Amino acid sequence: MGSQLVTWDSSTKGAGVTLDSSKLTFTITTDSVKSTIGKTYGKWYCECTINSGSNGAMIGIADSTVSMTGTLFASPKVYVYYQVSGGLYSNNQGPAYGSSYGVNDTISILLDLDNKKLEFWKNGVSQGVSNAN
């Protein structure tokens, strides 16, 4: 099985997202962006590092039907790890989950679609396993 380069998708990004020429790095003021390749089964890993910015980032996964503008965490088809509180938000609910994160932190996502498990990591430390329907 070969590797696959997945980048940020310029066709689905919100207006407040600027991608660099590689589509591997973005600057965001509002809205969101998805990757170029969605997944429906298997086990997947990705990570991102916060280089700069304010305290409003939400990193996570979303169904392909979810728009990348507006309030994402209100959708039941989105799971995001919120920078300020460390909460795991979906469907307007944000229970306590992990620790907050900021500049120079690396957030990893482990997604097991076969077993409906989602896990976020901060700088190599698991923040806990969640069920992701």
Regions found by a protein language model. Give the residues of each.
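PRY/SPRY (B30.2) beta-sandwich protein-interaction domains
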Residues: M1-N133
